[in-house]
A protein has these predicted regions:
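Conserved, single-site charged/polar hotspot
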Residues: 1-207
Length: 207
């Protein structure tokens, strides 16, 4: 509710005639009740009742900061800490700072691995960072990893060019910016922890 209210207060260029869209990269992921129930299987009624109770118990309520609806952003799971909003979106938000969010292997999709063939890695990276020098042994391409507030990747030098962890996440479909990277003749492998942009509330952490 609060998230929707905050969206209603500003116009989005991608959909000027609507307050909220169902594009996960823009506004809000959406699934209709029937499809959600199918995904939940035998837990469908329990989860449906839980959602209905949460809506009813907070009827008419919203979270405000300085009189305005907060940006009630959330994501799936954190790698031990959430990320400061300024590191992801460039704007400092007093209530969206990095905090502990202890989670573990019991969380679905907590660990994932993405291996990118060398030719594909070179093609995608050089399309965005043509100045990168990807000659020599692949293991030598990576240096100077700078951590963010959650211990993930803020930036890393690749072929002598500084690349943001968020850019790598987008380019190679990583689940988060909390990753380690290794490279060999077989390709570049990202070992990823957590799922999502990392800002705000971790759903599994809250659970």
């Amino acid at each position: 509710r609060t998230y929707t209210l905050s969206k209603m207060e500003r116009t989005v260029e991608a959909h000027p005639d609507a307050d909220v869209c169902t594009d996960i990269t823009c506004c809000q992921a959406y699934i209709d009740p029937a499809d959600a129930a199918a995904n939940w299987g035998e837990n469908a009624q329990t989860y449906t009742d839980k959602i209905a109770a949460a809506v009813a118990d907070t009827d008419g309520m919203a979270a405000l900061f300085q009189g305005q609806p907060i940006q009630a952003v959330f994501f799936s799971s954190a790698a031990g800490r959430t990320v400061d909003a300024v590191e992801v979106w460039g704007n400092a938000v007093p209530y969206l700072t990095s905090v502990d969010s202890p989670e573990g292997d019991e969380v679905p999709n907590y660990h994932s691995t993405v291996t990118v063939p060398l030719d594909e890695f070179k093609s995608k990276l050089l399309a965005q960072y043509p100045q990168a020098d990807l000659s020599g042994e692949p293991a030598g391409w990576f240096a100077n990893l700078v951590p963010n507030s959650a211990g993930g990747v803020e930036t890393v030098d690749i072929g002598g060019t500084t690349v943001g962890g968020g850019s790598l996440r987008t380019l190679f479909g990583l689940r988060s910016t909390s990753f380690t990277v290794s490279a060999s003749a077989d390709g570049v492998t990202f070992s990823v922890t957590g799922y999502g942009h990392g800002v705000g509330m971790s759903q599994y952490g809250a659970n």
